[in-house]
Regions:
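Single conserved hydrophobic/aromatic residue that forms the stacking wall/gate
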Residues: 1-7, 11
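Extended hydrophobic/Leu-rich segments
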Residues: 10-14, 32, 52
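Alpha-helical transmembrane signal-anchor/signal-peptide segments
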Residues: 13-29
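Extracytoplasmic/periplasmic soluble domains downstream of a signal peptide or transmembrane helix
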Residues: 15, 64-180
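Membrane-proximal extracellular/periplasmic loop immediately following the first transmembrane helix
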Residues: 29-35
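Extended boundary segments
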Residues: 35-82
Length: 180
């Protein structure tokens, strides 16, 4: 046998090791998942629903369409299936309280009588808060039902750092400011 043939045999018997390194790029599968989620976020372009303003707690935030996990990473989301502003029903919007920019971090400071504005299309809808409640997360869907009036309902997790309950702030439509 010649030496190149012997070297070739040794090479063939070595296990194939791709990405062999002392410093792996990903320490755990969890890190890889985080990277994968980041890639999904970069690819995802949410549809903007409107602009939400709550002056008393310094909220001035774009609202996206949808309340799925990915959409809510970009800001508050309009519950699909709830009404559009000015259409004679309940407009539902959910937002995070402690993560992803925490757009509703101070929602618990809103009081009855506070003003909330939602710009949708070319109109600005003015709402006055008339109801604040805390409901169980598993049974609180009724807060999004239509009550026979034009209203806006905001929901977020309650208490902070928990998903057990929902803080629900609701307001009645008082005025539509035309942008035309």
């Amino acid at each position: 046998r010649n030496s190149s043939s012997a070297a070739s045999d040794v090479y063939k018997r070595q296990p194939l090791r791709l990405f062999q390194t002392d410093n792996p790029v990903f320490e755990t599968l969890q890190e890889l998942t985080v990277i994968d989620q980041s890639a999904k976020i970069e690819e995802f372009q949410p549809e903007i629903f409107g602009l939400l303003e709550i002056p008393d707690i310094n909220v001035n935030q774009y609202v996206v369409s949808g309340t799925d996990e990915l959409s809510l990473q970009f800001g508050p989301g309009h519950y699909l299936g709830t009404k559009l502003p000015g259409s004679g029903g309940n407009v539902g919007i959910a937002g995070h309280r402690t993560t992803y920019g925490a757009p509703f971090s101070r929602l618990d400071l809103v009081e009855i009588g506070d003003e909330i504005y939602l710009t949708y299309g070319s109109n600005k809808y003015h709402y006055i808060v008339d109801d604040i409640e805390v409901v169980d997360a598993n049974t609180g869907d009724y807060v999004l039902f239509n009550r026979g009036d034009d209203r806006l309902t905001l929901t977020t997790c309650h208490p902070r750092y928990s998903a057990r309950q929902r803080l629900v702030v609701s307001g009645i439509l008082t005025r539509i400011e035309s942008g035309n």
